[in-house]
C-alpha cells in the first residue's frame, strides 16, 4: 500500500498511465479537502474562530506534506539551541496513534505505545518537559504551569491554528519536496504550496533553494536498541535494515553512504507498531539496524544484536542567529505586554 501511495504522490517518468488516471479520479476529493481546510484557516485568519495567544513565545515546527521530512530531528536541534541560549523550552505534540483524555505529561519511562513514537524519542534524547494531547492550548498551559517553561515548541503543529504562533518553521524533504503538488488524497499536500511563502523559515532536509535553510542529518553512532545490551556494532555482511518512517529509502541510503553492507531492507508503514515476531520473520537471527524512532518501540523485546543509527541535525550557519533574533523580538514584545498589564 505504501509503495502504491508513493508512486501516486511522487511520480516518476516511467510510471504507467494508470497512476495518472487514479490521480485524476481522486481530484474531486482533493477539491473537497481544499474547501474544508481553507475555510477553517480563513475563519482563524478573520478572527471568527479565535486563536489562543500564550504568555510565552511559540515556535511551530511542521510541514505541508504527509510523511517524514525531518521534523523530529529539527525539534531536538531547537531544544538544544534554545537551552544554549539560556531558555527553558517545552514541547507540545499530538501523540500520534495514542488515545488521551485531556493532556498527558511524557515521562522518560513511558513507552511509545502510551505516548507515541516521536514524543518518546524526543524525551529519551533530551529529557525536555513535554505534554501531549489533542488540545495543544491545554497542553501548552500545562507546560507553563508545571514546568515554568519560557518558550514552547509545537511539534507537527503547522495546521493546528487554534494555538497562536509567533514563529513558523516549515520542514521540507529536499528529494520529494511537494511531490505532484496536489492536495490529499490525490497528492501529499495538507495545504497548497503557496503556504511556504507565509512561514518565517523553510528548512530543507537535503538540497535547499534560494531563501531556504539546508539541514543535513549527520549519522553519529550505532547504539544498541536494548538497554540491556552493550554489544558494539561492527559491519558484517548479513545486516538487515528495517524502517517504519515516512521516507524509509532515505534511511537505507544513509546506511549505504555510511559504508554498511545491507543484504536486505524492509520498509514498514510510518508509525508502525512492532512486535518481536513481526521483525524476526523478516530478519531471522541476523543483525538488525533501524532508526531511532523505531528503536523506542522495540526496546522491551529487542535482541542483543539490534542497533539504531543516531543522527544529529546540522543546519546552515546563519540559521541560529536569524532564529534567535526573531525569538528575542517576540520575547521583548510579550514582556512589554505583561509590563503594560
Curated annotation (Swiss-Prot):
Pathway assigned to this chain's UniProt record: Glycolipid biosynthesis; lipid IV(A) biosynthesis; lipid IV(A) from (3R)-3-hydroxytetradecanoyl-[acyl-carrier-protein] and UDP-N-acetyl-alpha-D-glucosamine: step 6/6
Task: List the catalytic activities from the record.
Answer: a lipid A disaccharide + ATP = a lipid IVA + ADP + H(+)
Q: Which GO terms describe its molecular function?
A: ATP binding; tetraacyldisaccharide 4'-kinase activity
Residues noted as binding ATP in the record, renumbered to the chain: 65-72
Q: What is this protein called?
A: Tetraacyldisaccharide 4'-kinase
Q: What's a GO cellular component annotated to this UniProt protein?
A: plasma membrane
Is the Nucleotidyltransferase keyword given for this protein? no
Q: What does this protein do?
A: Transfers the gamma-phosphate of ATP to the 4'-position of a tetraacyldisaccharide 1-phosphate intermediate (termed DS-1-P) to form tetraacyldisaccharide 1,4'-bis-phosphate (lipid IVA).
- Enzyme Commission code(s) on record: 2.7.1.130
The keyword Oxidoreductase belongs to this UniProt entry's keyword annotation: no
Family listed = Belongs to the LpxK family.
**Keywords, in A-Z order:** ATP-binding, Kinase, Lipid A biosynthesis, Lipid biosynthesis, Lipid metabolism, Nucleotide-binding, Transferase
Q: Name one GO biological process term.
A: lipopolysaccharide core region biosynthetic process
Amino acid at each position: 500500500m505504501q509503495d502504491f501511495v508513493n508512486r501516486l504522490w511522487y511520480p516518476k517518468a516511467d510510471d504507467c498511465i494508470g497512476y495518472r488516471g487514479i490521480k485524476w479520479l481522486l481530484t474531486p476529493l482533493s477539491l473537497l479537502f481544499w474547501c474544508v481546510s481553507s475555510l477553517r484557516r480563513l475563519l482563524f485568519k478573520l478572527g471568527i474562530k479565535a486563536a489562543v495567544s500564550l504568555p510565552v513565545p511559540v515556535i511551530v515546527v511542521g510541514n505541508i506534506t504527509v510523511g517524514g521530512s525531518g521534523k523530529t530531528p529539527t525539534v531536538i536541534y531547537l531544544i538544544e539551541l534554545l537551552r544554549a541560549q539560556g531558555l527553558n523550552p517545552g514541547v507540545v505534540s499530538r501523540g500520534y496513534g495514542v488515545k488521551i483524555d485531556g493532556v498527558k505529561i511524557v515521562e522518560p519511562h513511558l513507552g511509545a505505545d502510551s505516548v507515541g513514537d516521536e514524543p518518546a524519542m524526543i524525551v529519551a534524547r533530551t529529557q525536555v518537559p513535554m505534554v501531549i494531547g489533542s488540545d495543544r492550548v491545554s497542553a501548552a498551559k500545562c507546560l507553563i504551569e508545571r514546568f515554568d517553561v519560557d518558550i514552547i515548541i509545537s511539534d507537527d503543529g503547522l495546521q493546528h491554528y487554534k494555538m497562536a504562533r509567533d514563529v513558523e518553521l516549515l520542514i521540507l524533504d529536499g528529494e520529494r519536496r511537494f511531490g505532484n503538488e496536489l492536495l490529499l488524497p490525490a497528492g501529499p499536500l495538507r495545504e497548497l504550496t503557496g503556504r511556504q511563502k507565509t512561514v518565517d523559515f523553510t528548512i530543507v532536509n537535503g538540497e535547499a533553494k534560494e531563501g531556504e535553510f539546508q539541514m543535513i542529518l549527520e549519522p553519529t553512532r550505532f547504539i544498541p536498541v536494548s538497554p540491556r545490551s552493550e554489544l558494539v556494532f561492527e559491519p558484517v555482511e548479513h545486516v538487515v535494515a528495517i524502517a517504519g518512517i515516512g521516507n524509509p529509502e532515505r534511511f537505507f541510503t544513509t546506511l549505504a553512504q555510511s559504508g554498511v553492507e545491507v543484504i536486505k531492507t524492509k520498509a514498514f508503514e510510518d508509525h508502525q507498531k512492532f512486535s518481536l515476531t513481526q521483525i524476526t520473520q523478516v530478519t531471522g537471527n541476523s543483525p538488525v539496524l533501524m532508526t531511532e524512532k523505531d528503536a523506542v518501540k522495540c526496546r522491551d523485546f529487542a535482541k542483543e544484536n539490534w542497533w539504531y543509527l543516531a543522527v544529529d541535525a546540522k543546519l546552515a550557519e546563519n540559521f541560529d542567529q536569524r532564529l534567535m533574533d526573531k525569538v528575542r523580538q517576540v520575547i521583548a514584545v510579550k514582556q512589554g505586554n505583561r509590563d503594560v498589564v
